[in-house]
Amino acid sequence: MKNTDTREVIMISIRLSDKNLQADYYPFILEPEARHLFLKELASHFAARTDLLDIQQHLDEILLTLDGRQTESYTFALTLPRLISITLDTCNACGKNQQWFRSLSACIAMDAGLSRPIRLFISDTIPPIIQWTGLHADRVSTLTQEMTAGNSPSCLITHALYKRLSPSIQSKYATLYYIHHICCYGAEL
């Protein structure tokens, strides 16, 4: 893929948050381990997929970029909330067995539209840094940041993604929300 390749993408933000289950327990070192375990479990859902273009992990957020030119990518994206719920259950069970006294939860936002990868090559030993054009990453990141306050469902799709869905699937996302002037539709995890 060249820097000039503009394509239809599905941008997904998964923002993790954790809850302390014991008032006097402060596991500073275990939070990165919990995020690593979640990412490892999440990666297993993408092992056989060819439509994953990019995955980036930030402190409490994972940004996924799927190829939006494939119809099945939209179907798969809409199954992600269920897969993430299963992944969270696995991670929380593991944490409980390890006596971490933390519980992970996630908020998910999805957007779709045209984007183009911009690759920055630093050296032969370091993989290129990829940044996607368009506001899709910013929009989903803004949504999940606001969703952590708990004032909306744990899964939102933007109108740009909504209009690409069949009417039968659209009916499952019937509740309209406006968050930071972003029109989106909600569903619970």
Each language-model region and where it sits:
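Alpha-helix/helix-capping structural signal
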Residues: 17-19, 113-115, 160
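Amphipathic alpha-helical regulatory segments at dimerization interfaces
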Residues: 41-48, 83, 90, 94-97, ...
